[in-house]
């Protein structure tokens, strides 16, 4: 019997087999790669043992989905620039410069990849290529269609050779090295069997405990602020940089109401007699300010917190830069995650190396998540509100004349921040016995309140912390809210919001206790039916075309979440799958994690805080109302936090080189000064928690967040699916007819609140709409993207008339963060305004007018296009489900292959009965694959 023919993948730039390539074909492939290059690769050696090699591309730029082409370009950089320069042990990281919505963004793609073994012997090129392709494939999923403007390699080695003196390979040698790597990679990639690693014993707590820690209420803290002007650092610079010209601080005593007389201010121009250059004046001002704060702390003998409002995105970058350069004998410890600065700790270091914490810089915005002007209205309206000041027209020459006005503005900001934090701290301590100086974010505060006051970790309530494998699977079923445009234009509409959608969804039954894996949910042997499942299920889904507004989300290759009809595989919360069946979906469970279904442990938390919030609102206590609102809304998302995090350290150049070579989680390193580097390393959760013992665990329980968002989508669907629904955004709907009276209440938890009567509305894309509401004079405009200042009423009207229209605009990014140099800059950028129908397809009338949308339809695939894993799953389902075979009856290849598989199974069974092994050739090779 001849084995069935193996399918081969389509030969294109992303999927190509190399072992049979002639030199001519290979050179043609490389020629296509080189067409994208803009000039020769650049390189720089910032310090001994560190090399950066860059290859710029030109238009048309390659897409991030062109994995093979980009992997080849990375390999050329390694072969021609990195390998000739390294000595001893070496590692490297990969970077993209991506163009996302008109904004160039630098992304480090992975932690450091080893180039050599421990003894300095080079790892074979094909294995390096394999690592590169694995990394690029992961990013291709989310950035498939984004332009790659440049790639770069950062190499770290024990020693280095000047490239001017190194032995650079000739063109022919380079081609041979690259071709050899590609051919050998192709071989090992086809033959290698994936490793099924054993689960290691967990080394961290398996459930979220009650918080029983004793807490003292610190009575003193600081608030501070900086004002900046824009200045070019060098005459050759294109972009201007924010440079502090004024600063101030205030010590807040919880036993005394804030007083503007206690604010100390500093002004850069005051140092013009001792400094000639403005940058020196600014640095002198910051030195005086920080030194004064440190002296105030030392007089009291214990460390203190300094709050800046928006430290994470603005002030913190300048503070970190200043401390690094000016406090060389101190230890600086920032806590950063995804380029967000959560805190900066300043330690004094004694002669014997002991560290003593002096200051912790923290961000009040991360705790309260609202602009200062709005906080002033809620917490301290008696102070007169936030002032106004023309920041754009501040120049060095004007500083003497605007001194009084700028310091008045600065002092008002400091006074408001002090009053807000004083009041918020008092409320949280009085209500819950928690000192907010001990927490960094509002979500961390909400979790601490829940664990301290409302949670019982007994058998009926304990929330399990999934291990890495469990969390990774469940996270596939963690989707956000449902946001879609259904009809682009409507008149006389009703806009409704749900009162606290996610908190109300937290009242439903929750996945509690330890999970258990079931691998054969789709098998006839499995006695579990869908209605008995409670957990997160991988399933094969069929959504009929007649469903106009589908329920179940699906993640596309570019990361876009759509709600399609058709056939697809995904991981979903079991309750969504049950509801989908009631709508007409066909659901074929395959495998999943099953939990105990228990009454929600969040009921006391939600009901109590919501009741207190209504009471505060009725009494006009805006500050209390605000605290209750953000606390209640922030808890569910905290459980979904990714346990994978990064640690950023400021270390010596020598320590940076050691981390680059020997830390497996090394990501990147930036040189801050001649002897200091900013190093980022990725933490492995279990090892990280082991080091930190149990005092700082990552309480991540993604099953809670995924269940809450699943319940929320179920709650919204009956209203979304109405034929008169024009638009939805997570917890809101815009409809033509009023909702039933029993569904509407201005205060009831989980009910809809009528926000606006809409005279007319234009809905162009998710989070991009314009409403003319009867309750307000000006149109309500929402626009997601850099061009929001250009998105006026006229633009919406013109775009509705021609949804394919594009408009390139220039705009100013006022606060562009540059972590490589620790700067905040103002940059001129370009942005293409227009619509791109990614979530639903446009429907036009006979005159070409956009009048409606319809869901994307996916999954009417040719069997040859299915990836091997999906193919194998579907073949097994066909064996178990006759109705699914009927569904695929029009796919002759699929049914034929199923019949071959069934026939092979019969032969195998008969062979076993005869006691003879089945010959390998009797099983189709593509099924083995």
UniProtKB/Swiss-Prot annotation:
Entries under SUPFAM superfamilies matching the protein: DNA/RNA polymerases, Ribonuclease H-like
A molecular-function term among this protein's GO annotations: DNA binding
InterPro entries tied to this protein: DNA-dir_DNA_pol_B, DNA-dir_DNA_pol_B_CS, DNA-dir_DNA_pol_B_mt/vir, DNA-dir_DNA_pol_B_mt_lin_plsmd, DNA/RNA_pol_sf, DNA_pol_palm_dom_sf, RNaseH-like_sf, RNaseH_sf
Pfam families: DNA_pol_B_2
GO biological process: DNA replication
Keyword terms: DNA replication, DNA-binding, DNA-directed DNA polymerase, Mitochondrion, Nucleotidyltransferase, Plasmid, Transferase
Transmembrane region(s): none
Reaction equations catalysed: DNA(n) + a 2'-deoxyribonucleoside 5'-triphosphate = DNA(n+1) + diphosphate
Skewed-composition ranges (Basic residues): 907-917
Domain of life according to the entry: Eukaryota
Note: This DNA polymerase requires a protein as a primer.
Name assigned to this protein: DNA polymerase
């Amino acid at each position: 019997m001849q084995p069935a023919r193996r399918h081969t993948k389509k030969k294109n730039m992303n999927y190509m087999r190399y072992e049979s390539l002639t030199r001519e074909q290979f050179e043609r492939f490389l020629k296509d790669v080189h067409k994208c290059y803009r000039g020769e690769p650049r390189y720089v050696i910032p310090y001994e043992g560190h090399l950066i090699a860059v290859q710029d591309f030109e238009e048309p730029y390659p897409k991030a989905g062109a994995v093979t082409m980009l992997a080849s370009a990375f390999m050329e950089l390694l072969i021609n620039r990195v390998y000739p320069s390294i000595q001893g042990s070496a590692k490297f990281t990969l970077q993209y410069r991506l163009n996302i919505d008109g904004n160039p963004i630098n992304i480090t793609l992975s932690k450091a990849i080893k180039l050599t073994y421990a003894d300095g012997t080079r790892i074979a090129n094909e294995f390096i290529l394999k690592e590169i392709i694995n990394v690029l494939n992961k990013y291709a999923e989310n950035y498939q269609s984004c332009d790659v403007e440049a790639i770069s390699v950062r190499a770290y080695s024990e020693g280095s050779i000047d490239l001017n003196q190194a032995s650079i390979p000739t063109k022919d040698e380079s081609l041979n090295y690259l071709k050899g790597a590609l051919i050998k990679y192709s071989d090992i990639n086809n033959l290698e069997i994936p490793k099924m690693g054993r689960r290691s014993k967990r080394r961290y707590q398996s459930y979220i405990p009650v918080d029983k820690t004793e807490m003292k209420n610190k009575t003193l803290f600081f608030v501070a602020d900086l004002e900046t002007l824009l200045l070019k650092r060098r005459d050759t610079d294109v972009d201007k940089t924010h440079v502090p010209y004024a600063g101030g601080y205030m010590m807040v005593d919880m036993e005394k109401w804030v007083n503007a007389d206690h604010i100390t201010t500093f002004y850069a121009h005051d140092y013009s007699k001792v400094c000639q250059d403005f940058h020196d004046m600014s640095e002198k001002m910051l030195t005086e300010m920080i030194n004064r704060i440190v002296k105030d702390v030392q007089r009291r003998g214990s460390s203190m917190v300094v709050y800046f409002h928006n430290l994470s995105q603005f002030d913190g970058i300048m503070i970190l830069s200043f401390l690094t350069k000016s406090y060389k004998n101190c230890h600086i410890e920032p806590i950063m995650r995804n380029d967000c600065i959560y805190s900066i700790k300043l330690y004094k270091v004694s002669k014997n190396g002991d560290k003593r914490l002096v200051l912790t810089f923290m961000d009040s915005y991360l705790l309260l998540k609202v602009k200062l002007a709005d906080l002033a209205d809620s917490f301290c309206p008696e102070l007169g509100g936030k002032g106004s000041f023309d920041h754009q027209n501040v120049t060095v020459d004007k500083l003497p004349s605007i001194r009084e006005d700028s310091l008045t503005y600065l002092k008002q900001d400091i006074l408001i921040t002090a009053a807000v934090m004083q009041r918020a701290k008092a409320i949280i301590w009085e209500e819950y016995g928690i000192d907010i100086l001990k927490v960094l974010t509002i979500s961390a505060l909400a979790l601490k309140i829940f664990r301290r006051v409302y949670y019982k970790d007994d058998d009926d309530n304990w929330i399990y912390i999934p291990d890495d494998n469990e969390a990774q699977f469940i996270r596939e079923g963690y989707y956000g809210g449902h946001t879609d445009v259904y009809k682009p234009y409507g008149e006389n509409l009703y806009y409704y919001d749900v009162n606290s959608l996610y908190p109300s969804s937290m009242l439903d039954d929750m996945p509690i206790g330890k999970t258990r894996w079931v691998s054969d949910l789709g098998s006839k042997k499995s006695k579990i039916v869908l209605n008995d499942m409670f957990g997160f299920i991988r399933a094969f889904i069929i959504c009929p075309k007649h469903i106009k507004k589908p329920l179940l989300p699906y993640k596309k290759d570019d990361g876009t979440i759509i709600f399609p009809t058709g056939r697809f595989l995904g991981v979903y919360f079991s309750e969504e799958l049950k509801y989908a069946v009631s709508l007409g979906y066909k659901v074929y469970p395959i495998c999943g994690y099953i939990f105990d279904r228990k009454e929600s442990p969040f009921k006391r938390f939600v009901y109590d805080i919501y009741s207190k919030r209504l009471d505060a609102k009725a009494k006009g206590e805006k500050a209390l109302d605000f605290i209750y609102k953000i606390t209640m809304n922030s808890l569910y998302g905290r459980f979904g936090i990714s346990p994978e995090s990064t640690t950023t350290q400021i270390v010596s150049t020598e320590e940076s080189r050691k981390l680059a070579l020997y830390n497996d989680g090394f990501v990147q390193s930036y040189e801050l000064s001649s002897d200091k580097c900013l190093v980022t390393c990725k933490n492995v959760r279990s090892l990280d928690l082991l080091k930190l013992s149990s005092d700082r665990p990552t309480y991540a329980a993604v099953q809670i967040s995924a269940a809450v968002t699943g319940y929320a989508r179920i709650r919204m669907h009956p209203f979304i699916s109405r034929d008169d629904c024009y638009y939805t955004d997570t917890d809101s709907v815009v409809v033509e007819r009023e909702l039933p009276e029993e569904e509407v209440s201005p205060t009831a938890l989980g009910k809809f609140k009528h926000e606006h009567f809409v005279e007319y509305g234009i809905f162009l894309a998710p989070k991009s709409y314009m409403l003319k509401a009867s309750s307000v004079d000006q149109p309500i405009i929402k626009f997601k993207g850099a061009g929001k200042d250009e998105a006026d009423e006229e633009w919406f009207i013109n775009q509705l008339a021609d949804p394919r229209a594009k408009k390139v605009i220039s705009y100013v990014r006022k606060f562009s963060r540059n972590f490589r140099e620790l700067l905040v800059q103002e940059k001129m950028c370009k942005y293409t305004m227009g619509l791109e129908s990614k979530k639903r397809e446009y429907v036009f009338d006979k005159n070409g007018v956009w009048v409606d949308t319809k869901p994307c339809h996916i999954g009417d695939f040719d069997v040859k296009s299915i990836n091997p894993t999906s193919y194998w799953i579907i073949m097994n389902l066909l064996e178990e489900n006759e109705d699914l075979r009927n569904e695929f009856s029009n796919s002759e290849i699929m049914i034929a292959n199923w019949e071959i598989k069934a026939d092979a199974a019969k032969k195998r069974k008969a062979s076993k009965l005869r006691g003879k092994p089945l010959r390998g050739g009797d099983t189709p090779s593509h099924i083995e694959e």
